[in-house]
Amino acid sequence: MKTISTRAAVFTSPAVDVVGKAFEEVSASFERFCLAAGIEALSAVMEKDAEEACGPRHCRSADRRGYRWGRTSGKIGFHGGKIDVERPRVRARGGKELALPSWEQAVAEDWLGAWAMNQMLLNVSTRKFKRSMRLPQGDVPAAAGAALSKSAASRQFVALSAERLKEWMASDLSGPDILVVQIDGIHISEHLVLVAAIGIDGKGEKHPLALLEGATENSAVVQALIDNLIERGLDPAAPRLFVIDGSKALSKAIRRSFGSHTPIQRCQVHKARNITERLPKALHATVRRALRQAWELDDADKAEKLIRNLAKRLEREAPGVAASILEGIDEILTVTRLGLPNELRRSLACTNIIENMMGTIRRVCRNVKRWRSPAMALRWTAAAMLEANKGFRRLKAHKQLAALRIALKAHYEKNSSNRDLAHKAKAA
């Protein structure tokens, strides 16, 4: 079978001949037919741009902006690599080159960069990029400069992922009605930890919000994360629930920025895991059952009493663990104290959204053998979070979020009135 070349010579022939030749092989290579037809259409648009600047050929109009200056070839990246496309050159009366709008737009689209990024997110190794190109003849040796080498693919991914990370970390947050913010640490490697934030709006839709290098125990890191959210439009005065992994530094930073009355829910999954890891294996089932029973109660006072009784029972066998159970007990039962429905409590009592997202992050980062720098980890993880966002589903209990909004409003009004009474008493 004769292979259609994508060099400039193909596209200098008349449009009918090019499309006709491509159509002859459409049954064997429909992708090449589309590519040939698309490039010919681009060539026609560039000719039109040249005519608008110079007028019709052999016409010396007085109001023309420039004149033709031969032809040249340039490279445009597609999903199958870079190809040579011939284009007309136009110069202004002063001799300066005039850009063709259609050519500038085609180059700026960066189809090849977007294709390379999708390939990386699908775990295609850079060594296999040539074979994974969408044109059927993916195993045909690529011409020099086709940008299909592993180094070129890596450069394209680095550039585009860095650009996406920058755009994402500067995106406006004043639009979404964020009711819940979950913040948790993501362990990329033994010595590399990132802090991620995900929001849930009033309709139950999930939004990746931010990502920073560092641990949740680092007060400077968590404060920088929160400052970034506020600078991008997250209203610190709006009633909102925070779900965190249990870090004291994170709790302090939230209350410092959003107010001392801000409701914070500690992740119950993290809490149970931290407790059982310090206990003998024989006690694991008993302790988990007691904690689950407490968390499923609708009465926060009864739930707290049950947890305190559990701590008393463990004082003899594991006194250190007993103290750990009582640590942060108010924040463990926040969703219960707010009076939320049981199904909504289960959804908001832990940071499982971030935990579940780790599956996508591990899949996307599976081919990374060595993390060269924190910047590399940020780029890859941000790309994975945005990839995971495509598959996010609404919160299961999204119909009950109206109850959360009412409970948060009542909580804020109650604490506001208490502060006013305290100020009056102090003034008296």
Briefly describe each language-model feature range.
Residues 2-5, 14-25, 34-37, 43, ...:
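Acidic/histidine-rich catalytic cores and adjacent linkers
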Residues 111-123:
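Short, amphipathic alpha-helical "recognition" segments used to contact nucleic acids or chromatin
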Residues 3-7, 19, 58-59, 68-71, ...:
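RNase H-like nuclease fold core
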Residues 39, 43, 47, 126, ...:
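Amphipathic alpha-helical transducer elements in NTP-driven molecular machines
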Residues 85, 275-305, 309:
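Metal-dependent DNA phosphodiester-chemistry modules and their immediately adjacent helices/loops
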